């Protein structure tokens, strides 16, 4: 009888999630895809996360046996669907009924062990759950069992209960979670917009990339007083990490002066720079060859996903591709107006979202860009410092 009941529920779930009417990824999925994370655990059955990460290399774990193969997941995002997926070859394995939840640790030993390992070694951010949610109870059980072994600090963001008594219970639940290393933030949602949740997620997405900055532009530039000064001033920003993916040109000039200034300051260069091997370093023609498209896409994604701030100078095909990837991943873009500005910079200046985003960080840079005046190093540094200070 239980099997028959599960079969009916299963058919309804599959029918619901396999129709295309009204089920689309939303702004929250988009922000998740912008985060610099390696693993996402979800109890949802749908494929909206996969859709949101379609521009990203992913490894999907739909069931226990998916965790068996040792797969090279370097630079990929792992999505673990601990309760199964509607697109699984064996949808009957979806965790649906009360019995499924109660027997989960026995029927999914590999997933359970992986969950234990991640809870011990990674910090989790729980989103979309409430204290009454059965989906979260099994995970809380694991954390309680592991807390004596010193788990990492975990975080939970939940919507405030509207009922007074429910809110009291919610606060007690949140207080209890502190004993197990889980810090809970309860946000107001009176207008049902979940605006604060989105703001929290956007802030996390930005900060997940670290205090990182990437300078992109033409490979043909050989010298520039502006870039040399920029490299020196960037090196003087404490805890800033400079990302480099060019062997010559704009980024390399900045890198050289950045390293020189770090050495002058007696700082370890190893802790201040991250260098990514560029497959086009010795043959720039590869940028335009279709057969190398997947390789270049992977390279640019790995580089930009680590970048919080991108400074853009005039460039060509490669620079444009990096800008497009930065837009997808929510990177803060700072266009630079120089005497040799080209249409690539003009396109950025015409992008209201990019320019307006800089207004709160540096009014002087914002007004210079709006008035199409030459950018100064001082304006750029002010903007970068204020972004990192948020």
Model-derived segments and their meaning:
Residues 27-36, 56-59, 67-76, 89, ...:
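SIR2/sirtuin-family catalytic core signature
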Residues 79-111, 290-299:
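Glycine-rich phosphate- or other oxyanion-binding loops that anchor nucleotides, phosphorylated ligands
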Residues 15-22, 99-107, 220, 286-292, ...:
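Short, flexible loop segments at the rims of nucleotide/cofactor-binding pockets, characterized by
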Residues 210-219:
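Short, hydrophobic/glycine-enriched beta-strand segments
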Residues 1-15, 67-73, 261, 265:
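A phosphate-binding glycine/aspartate-rich beta-alpha loop in the early core of alpha/beta enzymes
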Residues 1-34, 38-41, 46-57, 116, ...:
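Gly/serine-rich nucleotide phosphate-binding loop at the start of the catalytic core
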């Amino acid at each position: 009888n239980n099997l028959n009941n599960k079969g009916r529920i299963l058919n309804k779930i599959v029918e619901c999630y396999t129709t295309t009417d009204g089920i689309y990824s939303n702004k929250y999925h988009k922000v998740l895809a912008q985060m610099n994370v390696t693993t996402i655990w979800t109890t949802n059955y749908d494929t909206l996360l996969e859709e949101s990460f379609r521009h990203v290399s992913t490894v999907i774990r739909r069931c226990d046996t998916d965790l068996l193969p040792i797969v090279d997941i370097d630079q990929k995002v792992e999505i673990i669907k601990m309760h199964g997926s509607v697109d699984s070859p064996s949808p009957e394995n979806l965790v649906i009924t009360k019995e499924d939840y109660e027997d989960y640790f026995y029927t999914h030993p590999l997933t359970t062990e992986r969950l234990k390992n991640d809870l011990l070694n990674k910090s989790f951010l729980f989103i979309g759950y409430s204290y009454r949610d059965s989906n979260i109870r099994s995970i809380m059980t694991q954390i309680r069992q592991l807390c004596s072994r010193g788990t990492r600090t975990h975080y939970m963001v939940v919507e405030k209960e509207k009922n007074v008594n429910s809110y009291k219970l919610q606060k007690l639940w949140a207080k209890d979670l502190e004993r197990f290393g889980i810090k809970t933030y309860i946000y107001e949602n009176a207008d049902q917009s979940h605006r604060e949740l989105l703001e929290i997620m956007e802030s996390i997405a930005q900060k997940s990339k670290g205090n990182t900055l990437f300078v992109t532009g033409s490979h043909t530039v050989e010298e520039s007083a502006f870039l040399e000064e920029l490299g020196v001033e960037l090196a003087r920003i404490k805890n800033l990490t400079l990302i480099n993916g060019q062997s010559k040109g704009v980024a390399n000039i900045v890198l050289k002066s950045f390293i020189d200034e770090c050495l002058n300051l007696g700082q370890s260069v190893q802790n201040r720079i991250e260098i990514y091997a560029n497959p086009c370093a010795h043959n720039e023609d590869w940028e335009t060859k279709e057969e190398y498209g997947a390789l270049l896409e992977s390279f640019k994604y790995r580089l930009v996903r680590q970048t919080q701030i991108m400074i853009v100078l005039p460039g060509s095909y490669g620079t444009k591709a990096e800008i497009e990837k930065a837009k997808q991943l929510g990177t803060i873009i700072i266009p630079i107006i120089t005497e040799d500005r080209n249409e690539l910079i003009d396109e950025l200046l015409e992008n209201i979202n990019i320019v307006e985003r800089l207004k709160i960080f540096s009014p002087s840079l914002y007004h210079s860009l709006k008035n199409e005046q030459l950018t100064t190093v001082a304006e750029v540094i002010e903007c970068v410092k204020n972004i990192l200070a948020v």
